[in-house]
UniProtKB/Swiss-Prot annotation:
The keyword ATP-binding applies. Zn(2+) binds at residues 185, 194, 197, 200. Its EC number is 6.3.4.20. Catalyzes the ATP-dependent conversion of 7-carboxy-7-deazaguanine (CDG) to 7-cyano-7-deazaguanine (preQ(0)). Belongs to the QueC family. This is 7-cyano-7-deazaguanine synthase. Homodimer. Pathway: Purine metabolism; 7-cyano-7-deazaguanine biosynthesis. Pfam families: QueC (PF06508). SUPFAM superfamilies: Adenine nucleotide alpha hydrolases-like. The gene is queC. The keyword DNA-binding does not apply. One of its GO terms (molecular function) is ligase activity, forming carbon-nitrogen bonds.
Length: 217
C-alpha cells in the first residue's frame, strides 16, 4: 500500500533522481523541491525542471543564494576542486543539507506532507558530514520539535554504495533514464559527465562495478 505524499529534495543528479523513482513506487503524490544556492552550473536547476516536467510532477524552486554568499567552496566559487585524502573536500558546502532539509520541512508542512525524501548516503558520502545517518536522524527530531509536526525524513540510499544505487535504479526501471538524463558532474556535463571530477569518478566506478556484478549474475 502506498503512503499518501512525499516531498523530494531534488537536484536532478543520480541520487535524487533514483529517489524520485523510488518515491513514485511508494507514494500516491510526489512533489519536488530544488534549491538555487549559487551553484556553479545553473544547468543543474534546468535539468531538475526538465525531469520534473517529463514526470508530470509539481516542482518548487527556492532561492537560497544567500548560502553562496557566506560560504567559499568549489561548488559556488570559481576555484579548483580539491579532495585531499582524509579531509573534507572543498566541494562541501557548509550547512547545505541542514538548510535544504529545514526549508523543505517548512514547505512540506504548508503542503500537508509528512515524508521528506533525500538522497544522502553514508556509504559513499565523500567526506561530507551532513550526509551521515546520525545527522539526518538528529535533524529529524529537531524539525519535529521546532514545528510540532511529525516529519519523517526518508533516506532510501543511506546504506547503499554507488553500485547498489545503480542496481536500485535498474530495479525501478529507471537505469537508462538516470544514466542519460541526470547531472552529477561538477563541471556541468549531463549523463556520463566529464570523467575527471570526483563526482564523475564515484559515479563511473559504481556503474562499472554494478555492470560487472550484473554480468556475473
Amino acid at each position: 500500500m502506498k503512503r499518501q505524499s512525499a516531498l523530494i529534495v531534488f537536484s536532478g543528479g543520480q541520487d535524487s533522481t533514483t529517489c524520485l523513482f523510488w518515491a513514485l513506487k511508494h507514494y500516491e503524490i510526489v512533489e519536488l523541491v530544488t534549491f538555487a544556492y549559487g551553484q556553479r552550473h545553473s544547468l543543474e536547476i534546468e535539468v531538475a525542471k526538465e525531469i520534473a516536467q517529463e514526470q508530470g510532477l509539481k516542482h518548487h524552486v527556492l532561492d537560497m543564494s544567500l548560502l553562496g554568499q557566506i560560504t567559499e567552496n568549489a561548488l559556488t566559487s570559481d576555484i579548483d576542486i580539491e579532495a585531499e585524502e582524509g579531509e573534507v573536500p572543498n566541494t562541501f558546502v557548509d550547512g547545505r543539507n541542514h538548510l535544504f532539509l529545514s526549508f523543505a520541512a517548512v514547505l512540506a508542512k504548508q503542503r500537508g506532507i509528512i515524508d521528506i525524501v533525500t538522497g544522502v548516503c553514508e556509504t559513499d558520502f565523500s567526506g561530507y558530514p551532513d550526509c551521515r545517518d546520525v545527522f539526518v536522524k538528529s535533524l529529524n527530531v529537531t524539525l519535529n520539535l521546532a514545528m510540532a509536526y511529525d516529519f519523517v525524513i526518508q533516506t532510501p540510499l543511506m546504506w547503499l554504495d554507488k553500485a547498489e544505487t545503480w542496481a536500485l535504479a535498474d530495479q525501478l526501471g529507471a537505469f537508462d533514464y538516470v544514466r542519460e538524463k541526470t547531472l552529477t558532474c561538477y563541471n556541468g556535463i549531463i549523463g556520463t559527465g566529464c570523467g575527471d571530477c570526483p563526482a564523475c569518478h564515484l559515479r563511473q566506478k559504481g556503474l562499472e562495478k554494478y555492470l560487472a556484478e550484473k554480468g556475473d549474475a
